């Protein structure tokens, strides 16, 4: 089969969605840090969205945020409770630091507000369960902020697996990382345990996990043998700290900068995963999905950006011959993935549809991360159990 035939077979039609602009959705933004910049930039493109309020714990920060983005007549509050108690909203973006994700999301759902929650879903599996229970009770739309889901190349991965071209998938290798990339340009909220709770595992590792788990239908995890470390983050001589003039960050570092896990999934699938904020390596390797009929190699990815390092390849047999079929990178994708993430959430709010990135899947992602941390602390393999919601 020719390369173009493979591409045409799997490429999804990219049709423009007609948006009903007759009713405007009133939205608020909780937390006005750097990720909120991405949210408001997409909201401003949508004619059916009215940004009416925002909240931030730091005095004056919300006001400066909206001024920077040229959004006027916006009411600003000091915390999520004040905002939700005083506004009639259709939806909120939760863009706060990890430790407050559960609290803000649950409060919004309990007060009848739809939520798009930035990843990670939360810090612990217990918090994830509480969020899912609140969502179920509220009947509102709660979608988790995984914009790579909307990248056409990431969609292609799922389509290839679902097509049966690979046969039964039995082994997956995935991960990613940065040679030097502990996220400190935004201050210390990403690296302090009191605010972040988890480091590289939840910040960028969740994207790698989602890419492959979504492709194979999010099977439940059974056990994990995990390992985490913080060698770079706690080193005051770490070059990024020194170059940016903040060697004191090392004393504040309280999360992981590397994590790895060997996970057994339902259906006889093994998942070999590793992620790093910092390492003495250019990449921990390609993503590989191995099956009984074929295997898929995805060049080293930056899943958090929804990007892959080059054309994918399927290794399979054709007419008794071993062949490699190259899948070109899809570059023409229309609007950016972040816009698609926000738009799909709001469309679900308008229609009463299902969340585009549902908690029923992301709780599995969260359970694996939780299991890796537990296993590393105990120094042995642990079972993963996800309670019924």
Language-model segments: residues:
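Hydrophobic residues in well-ordered beta-strands that form the structural core
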Residues: 78, 117, 142-144, 173, ...
């Amino acid at each position: 089969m020719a390369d173009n035939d493979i591409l045409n077979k799997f490429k999804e039609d990219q049709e423009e969605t007609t948006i009903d602009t007759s009713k405007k959705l009133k939205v608020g933004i909780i937390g006005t840090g750097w990720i909120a910049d991405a949210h408001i930039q997409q909201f401003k493109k949508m004619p059916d969205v009215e940004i009416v309020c925002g909240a931030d714990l730091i005095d004056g920060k919300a006001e400066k945020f909206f001024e920077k983005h040229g959004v006027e007549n916006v009411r600003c509050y000091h915390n999520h409770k004040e905002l939700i108690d005083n506004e009639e909203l259709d939806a909120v973006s939760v863009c706060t630091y990890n430790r407050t994700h559960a609290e803000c999301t649950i409060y919004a759902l309990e007060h009848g507000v739809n939520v798009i929650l930035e990843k990670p879903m939360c810090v612990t599996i217990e918090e994830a369960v509480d969020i899912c229970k609140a969502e179920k009770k509220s009947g509102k739309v709660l979608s988790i902020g995984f914009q790579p889901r909307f990248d056409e190349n990431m969609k292609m991965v799922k389509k290839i697996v679902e097509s049966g071209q690979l046969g039964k998938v039995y082994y997956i290798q995935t991960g990613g990382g940065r040679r030097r990339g502990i996220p400190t340009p935004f201050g210390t909220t990403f690296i302090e345990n009191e605010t972040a709770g988890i480091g590289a595992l939840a910040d960028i590792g969740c994207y790698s996990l989602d890419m492959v788990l979504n492709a194979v239908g999010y099977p439940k995890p059974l056990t994990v043998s995990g390992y985490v470390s913080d060698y770079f983050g706690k080193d005051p001589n770490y070059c990024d700290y020194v170059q940016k003039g903040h060697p004191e960050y090392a004393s504040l570092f309280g999360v992981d900068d590397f994590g790895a896990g060997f996970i057994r999934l339902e259906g006889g699938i093994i998942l070999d995963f590793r992620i790093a904020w910092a390492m003495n390596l250019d990449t921990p390797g390609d993503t590989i999905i191995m099956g009984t009929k074929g295997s898929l190699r995805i060049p080293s990815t930056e899943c958090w950006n929804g990007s892959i390092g080059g054309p994918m390849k399927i290794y399979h047999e054709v007419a008794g011959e071993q062949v490699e079929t190259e899948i070109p990178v899809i570059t023409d994708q229309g609007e950016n993935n972040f816009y698609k993430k926000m738009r799909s959430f709001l469309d679900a709010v308008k229609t009463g549809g299902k969340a585009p990135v549902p908690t029923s899947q992301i709780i599995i992602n969260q359970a694996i991360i939780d299991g890796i941390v537990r296993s590393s602390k105990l120094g042995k393999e642990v079972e993963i159990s996800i309670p019924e919601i």
